[in-house]
Amino acid sequence: RLMSDGHPTGLLAAPSPTDTAAASLGEMTSLPLTKVKPPALPEKLVARARLTQRIDRPVTFVNAPSGFGKTTLLNEWRQGCGMPVAWVALNADDDHPLRFWSTVVTALQTVDPSLGQSWLSQLHSSSPSTLSEIVVNLTNDIIRASDAPNAHHRIGLVLDDYHHIQHPGIHTSLQTWLEHIPPTLKLVVA
């Protein structure tokens, strides 16, 4: 199976300057910053300390039906966890590997602008990279950033509304990331 740029599914390559796909790459990687900003908490909030305390593992999956307050719970946890947290509000538009990982990197850069630099250089290189290689480089960026002077030793990442993601390449690359998740990253998927 081939992507629209002619590469096999699961591979990313930066388009050449003459490639008409360059415009679609720009459209795919540009996104409103509201996607990486957590929603405001309601004024009248029922605190759920017992639930927020359960979000303590390196990776936490929150599963509940729509309307049960997952987003509010994660936002409450974010405000009280004591570390900077990047936020991704996913929707059906993010169900493409390039768009998904671009959004994740943009969110992480709200916490630390140096995160994702290797990823960006791979994206714009002339040779295609597998999603696995890109995810490994993102992991390495997070580890290097946490070792830098004055760096946050731990950061969080919330992937909210992950149920919109159906693309097998995203699931596979996220699984690869989970296998190599840096100890300084706390990932919450809802």
Task: Please tell me what each predicted stretch does.
Residues 59, 164-169, 175-190:
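Sensor-1/coupling segment of RecA-like P-loop NTPase cores
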Residues 87, 157, 187-189:
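Structural beta-sheet core signal
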Residues 160-161:
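Walker B catalytic acidic pair
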Residues 52, 139, 171-175:
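A short, noncatalytic alpha-helical element within ATPase nucleotide-binding/catalytic domains
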Residues 12, 66-68, 72-155, 164-166:
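Conserved phosphate-binding/catalytic loops and adjacent sensor/switch elements of nucleotide-binding enzymes
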Residues 17-54, 117-123:
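Conserved adenine-nucleotide phosphate-binding loops and their immediately adjacent elements
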Residues 62:
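Hydrophobic anchor at the beta1->P-loop junction of P-loop NTPases
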